[in-house]
UniProtKB/Swiss-Prot annotation:
GO terms for cellular component: nucleus. Its main location: nucleus. May be involved in transcriptional regulation. SUPFAM superfamilies: beta-beta-alpha zinc fingers, KRAB domain (Kruppel-associated box). GO terms for molecular function: DNA binding; DNA-binding transcription factor activity; zinc ion binding. Keywords: DNA-binding, Metal-binding, Nucleus, Repeat, Transcription, Transcription regulation, Zinc, Zinc-finger. It comes from Homo sapiens (Human). PANTHER family: IP01243P-RELATED, ZINC FINGER PROTEIN. Disulfide bonds: none annotated. A zinc finger (C2H2-type) spans 176-198, 204-226, 232-254, 260-282, 288-310, 316-338, 344-366, 372-394, 400-422, 428-450. It is found in: Nucleus. Gene3D superfamilies: 6.10.140.140, Classic Zinc Finger (3.30.160.60). Belongs to the krueppel C2H2-type zinc-finger protein family. This is Zinc finger protein 223. The gene is ZNF223.
């Protein structure tokens, strides 16, 4: 039987390190590498593509890591790159000039252990008659004999030691559990890497910003923030992402399916983690706690923003005025003050606003919506700040005090206007007569004097007043007399 030209060998799927690269891996990562290589090796055996399986299998099981022999290097033809010498051997049948001994010697010369610069095929033969085991594996390949059969998938295997692997894959067995959080893993080496999260070990540091990570994969993903690399592209909209998981989450947006429903309010979500975050609103759970002031938050991102308050760092600042902000979003909002940009327009009256939240509040003027209601008197307000200010009328709270005369006020704007009396500041000017005034409302009254307008009318006597306040005073006096 002639071997297929498309036959996959262990070298085709193996991840081979140089000695320098292997030195960058810690013990847990080496074990994980060994486990993955071992599984790839077993999978190849299950389809009968690898004849010299036993010794490679034993060396992987003994955690003796392999790497490409770079002792002999040659100058590459393109770009002058140094490339490791790679030996290839023809895909020939057993009667075309390549014996089992020759194949084994070629493999032994191509792969070497980290502590040896070269390795001889005789070193393999000394360990438990490995050559006879190779010949046994090759003879099985020649004859096609596969004595072990799986009862579930009817797949045949040439080695009983490999027979259990497909069953393990089908059952997705995760026998190694974390004592801290209960998360399970297929490999104990993967568990060891996971446990760094609980131990706080962060062995991998970014050279650009100094941020540390518990896994090298997380560092590689983070470095794309600095390089701008987004290798994972959405086929529908072309949007790029730094990590595959973000692309997977994004693709569900195109599907539009919302399978996760909140039992409390009925709101639907695309992802289960979005539902979990939302449910904290109903349960009041705040699992993320500040270690400095013990304030708790529903989201980790909220905690991260809060922690910057303690450090005093404001990494986002305006180049013109130097004002700093904790979040870049706040910086972008602030910059609209300098640019004068007001991109949000009201369709009813055409008024423009810098922020979408301002537009939403303004639209309540047209709709008449007043969602904030006082529990004591039933009066409603458009904004929450308006309701909070109204509450002070019931409580009598006046938190803003004048340092000059001691007079108290319910709101900050009132004390600012009051202080102009002490400093004799009159920032408002009548456009008709040029008279300077303390308050903006006084300027409006002055303009009414020039125009003769008296908009406030008493319904009982018909008398008109320039200011609504004057009418209210007259009415209160009349009611007291009666």
């Amino acid at each position: 039987m002639t071997m297929s030209k498309e036959a996959v060998t262990f070298k085709d799927v193996a991840v081979v390190f140089t000695e320098e690269e292997l030195g960058l891996l810690d013990l847990a990562q080496r074990k994980l590498y060994r486990d993955v290589m071992l599984e790839n090796f077993r999978n190849l055996l299950s389809v009968g593509h690898q004849p010299f399986h036993r010794d490679t299998f034993h060396f992987l099981r003994e955690e003796k890591f392999w790497m490409m022999d770079i002792a002999t290097q040659r100058e590459g033809n393109s770009g002058g790159k140094i490339q490791p010498e790679m030996k290839t051997f023809p895909e020939a049948g057993p009667h075309e000039g390549w014996s089992c001994q020759q194949i084994w010697e070629e493999i032994a010369s191509d792969l070497t252990r980290p502590q040896d610069s070269t390795i001889k095929s005789s070193q393999f033969f000394e360990q438990g008659d490995a050559h006879s085991q190779v010949e046994e594996g090759l003879s099985i390949m020649h004859t096609g004999q596969k004595p072990s059969n799986c009862g579930k998938c009817k797949q045949s295997f040439s080695d009983m030691s490999i027979f259990d692997l497909p069953q393990q894959i089908r059952s997705a067995e995760k026998s190694h559990s974390c004592d801290e959080c209960g998360k399970s893993f297929c490999y104990i080496s993967a568990l060891h890497i996971h446990q760094r999260v609980h131990l706080g070990e962060k062995l991998f540091k970014c050279d650009v910003c100094g941020k540390e990570f518990s896994q090298s994969l997380h560092l590689q993903t983070h470095q794309r923030v600095h390089t701008g690399e987004k290798p994972f592209k959405c086929e529908q909209c072309g949007r790029g992402f730094r990590c595959r998981s973000a692309l997977t989450v994004h693709c569900k947006l195109h599907m539009g399916e919302k399978h996760y429903n909140c039992e409390a309010c009925g709101r639907a979500f695309i992802h289960d983690f979005q539902l979990q975050k939302h449910q904290r609103i109903h349960t009041g759970e705040k699992p993320f706690k500040c270690e400095i002031c013990s304030v708790s938050f529903r989201l980790r991102s909220s905690l991260n923003r809060h922690c910057v308050v303690h450090t005093g760092k404001k990494p986002n600042s305006t180049g013109e005025y130097g004002k700093g902000f904790i979040r870049r979003l706040d910086l972008c909002k602030h910059q609209t003050i300098h640019t004068g940009e007001k991109p949000y327009n009201c369709k009813e009256c055409g008024k423009s606003f810098r922020r979408s939240s301002y537009l939403l509040i303004h639209q309540r003027v047209h709709t008449g919506e007043k969602p904030y209601k006082c529990d004591k008197c039933g009066k409603s307000y458009i904004t929450k700040s308006g309701l909070d200010l109204h509450h002070r009328a019931h409580t009598g709270e006046r938190p803003y005090n004048c340092d000059d005369c001691g007079k108290s006020f319910r709101q900050a704007s009132s004390i600012l206007n009051h202080k102009r009396l002490h400093c004799r500041k009159k920032p408002f000017k009548c456009e008709d007569c040029g008279k300077k005034l303390v308050y903006r409302s006084y300027r409006k009254d002055q303009q009414k004097n020039h125009s003769g307008e008296n908009p406030s009318k008493c319904e009982d006597c018909g008398k008109r007043y320039k200011r609504r306040l004057n009418l209210d005073i007259i009415l209160s006096l009349f009611l007291n007399d009666t």
